Regions:
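Active-/binding-site microenvironments in catalytic and ligand-binding cores
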Residues: 1-133
Length: 133
């Protein structure tokens, strides 16, 4: 299970190393340095250089709306560097009604044996919300 402060960032297109550094910096600034989860809303894909930045950023998890977090030219290397650095990957999120900012994430995967991935029930809590939809 993954629970903790999460930063949601909106981005469309390829995320290069420079953009990844900006995202990490914004996450730390917004969440007062207490963030180990970054979720990317939009049609974004992480390049190998960006994956290196995220891998060094002491993240627990990175998530995206696409079915793969990686750019088409670096699917295996992006997944490998993140996983080798202990960064879990959460793909296929529905963030279309989530504004950028700070949230609390709870992601509870199904316990399956001998698999490289598992479906999970993930939800965000916005402690600043004034009303519930």
């Amino acid at each position: 299970n993954v629970v903790g402060t999460a930063y949601v960032h909106y981005h469309n297109g390829r995320i290069n190393g420079e953009m990844a550094e900006k995202i990490v910096s914004l996450a730390r600034e917004t969440c007062k340095n207490d963030v180990h989860i970054i979720l990317i809303r939009g049609r974004a894909a992480v390049s190998f250089e960006a994956a290196q930045v995220f891998a060094r950023a002491d993240l627990t998890l990175i998530g995206c709306e696409f079915q793969s977090i990686a750019t088409a030219d670096a699917v295996v290397p992006v997944h490998r560097i993140l996983l080798d650095h202990g960064v879990l990957i959460l793909e296929g999120l529905r963030l279309d009604f989530v504004d950028p900012g700070e949230y609390f994430l709870c992601a509870a995967p199904l316990k399956l044996g001998n698999t490289e991935g598992a479906p999970c029930r993930a939800f965000l809590i916005d402690f600043e919300v004034k009303h519930w939809r």
